[in-house]
């Protein structure tokens, strides 16, 4: 009977052993038992005597070293790891109690200020006290140019926006007022341009026939092309006779008549002695008036 219950060794079939390590004797539908699930550690329940020992050590130090923990663990008959976890939880509980006491001592208004609501950037405008003053004196608002006292165009500086590509004035208000007050003196300078109305430039083709109306805005920069016929003769080397003085007013320059002229009349080629007066010595060998004075150097 026992021989029937305990079969003999397996015989090989076609030289293959059925009990080898590579032979699966179980049906594939039958699964193997899985590894046992790790059970959760049980909660430790401390007795009154254990808590008294732990609280006594916690009153001495909140961070005991490993030797102090092992000593207490031997007294209360607990592993050292449980004592370490108890101290960790006790420190967290102590911090929580301190925060609650601070919140109870503070008034309700102080609690709201201690933890303000987080606002998004750019939602609320800045107050006037937060805005830094502009060191250059440039304001964000545009102001038109101030008129001068005599009605003439002045060099008043207009403040523009800081984002404008136009030129900005780095001058303070005091210097700006000084520039406005000295407007007439600036307009009398030879480089101040008087702007003519647009109708004087492009109203009709007849406007181009009058040089005074066409060049009225450029008179301070342009000297008259041709002096009057009765004026003094031009000399290429004489400074004062080149043209009228720059100190003349634009109205006097624009009022001059530009007549037709001939290079022969203006430069007076007919009389070379009166026009082409070179500052040369009469005995100079380059004097062309006396051909007998011509001298040639032999090379």
From Swiss-Prot:
GO CC list: chromatin; nucleus; RNA polymerase II transcription regulator complex
Keyword Transcription regulation: yes
Localization: Nucleus
Swiss-Prot/TrEMBL keywords: Activator, Developmental protein, Differentiation, DNA-binding, Homeobox, Neurogenesis, Nucleus, Sensory transduction, Transcription, Transcription regulation, Vision
Keyword tRNA processing set for record: no
Region (Disordered) residue spans: 94-155, 236-258
InterPro entries to which the protein is assigned, alphabetical: HD, Homeobox_CS, Homeodomain-like_sf, Otx_TF_C
DNA-binding region extent: 39-98
Pfam families named in the record: Homeodomain, TF_Otx
Compositionally biased spans, kind Polar residues: 247-258
Tissue expression as described in the entry: Retina.
Protein's GO biological process: cell differentiation; nervous system development; positive regulation of transcription by RNA polymerase II; regulation of DNA-templated transcription; regulation of transcription by RNA polymerase II; visual perception
Primary localization class, coarse: nucleus
Biased composition (Low complexity): 97-114, 236-246
GO molecular function: DNA-binding transcription activator activity; DNA-binding transcription factor activity; DNA-binding transcription factor activity, RNA polymerase II-specific; nuclear receptor binding; RNA polymerase II cis-regulatory region sequence-specific DNA binding; RNA polymerase II transcription regulatory region sequence-specific DNA binding; RNA polymerase II-specific DNA-binding transcription factor binding
Domain of life from the UniProt record: Eukaryota
The protein's assembly and partners: Interacts (via the homeobox) with NRL (via the leucine-zipper domain). Interacts with PDC, RAX2, RORB and SCA7.
Its job: Transcription factor that binds and transactivates the sequence 5'-TAATC[CA]-3' which is found upstream of several photoreceptor-specific genes, including the opsin genes. Acts synergistically with other transcription factors, such as NRL, RORB and RAX, to regulate photoreceptor cell-specific gene transcription. Essential for the maintenance of mammalian photoreceptors.
UniProt similarity note: Belongs to the paired homeobox family.
Record-given protein name: Cone-rod homeobox protein
Organism annotation: Bos taurus (Bovine)
């Amino acid at each position: 009977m026992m021989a029937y219950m305990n079969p003999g060794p397996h015989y090989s079939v076609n030289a293959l052993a059925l009990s080898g390590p590579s032979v699966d004797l179980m049906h594939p539908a039958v699964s193997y038992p899985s590894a046992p699930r790790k059970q959760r550690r049980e909660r430790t329940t401390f007795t009154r005597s254990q808590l008294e020992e732990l609280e006594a050590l916690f009153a001495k130090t909140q961070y005991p070293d490993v030797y102090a923990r092992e000593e207490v663990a031997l007294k209360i008959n607990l592993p050292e790891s449980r004592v370490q976890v108890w101290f960790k939880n006790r420190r967290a509980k102590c911090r929580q109690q301190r925060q609650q006491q601070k919140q109870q001592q503070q008034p309700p208004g102080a609690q709201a200020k201690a933890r303000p609501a987080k606002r998004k950037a750019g939602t609320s405008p800045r107050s006037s006290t937060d805005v830094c003053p502009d060191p250059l004196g440039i304001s964000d608002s545009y102001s038109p140019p101030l008129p001068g006292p005599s009605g003439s165009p002045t060099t008043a500086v207009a403040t523009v926006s800081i984002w404008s590509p136009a030129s900005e004035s780095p001058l303070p208000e005091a210097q700006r007022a000084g520039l406005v007050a000295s407007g007439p003196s600036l307009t009398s300078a030879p480089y101040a341009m008087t702007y003519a109305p647009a109708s004087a430039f492009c109203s009709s083709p007849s406007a181009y026939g009058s040089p005074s109306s066409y060049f009225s805005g450029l008179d301070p920069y342009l000297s008259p092309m041709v002096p009057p016929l009765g004026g003094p003769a031009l000399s290429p080397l004489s400074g004062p006779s080149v043209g009228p003085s720059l100190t003349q007013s634009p109205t006097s320059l624009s009022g001059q008549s530009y007549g037709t002229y001939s290079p022969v009349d203006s430069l007076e080629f007919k009389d070379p002695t009166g026009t082409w007066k070179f500052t040369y010595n009469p005995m100079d060998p380059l004097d062309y008036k006396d051909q007998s004075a011509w001298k040639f150097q032999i090379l």
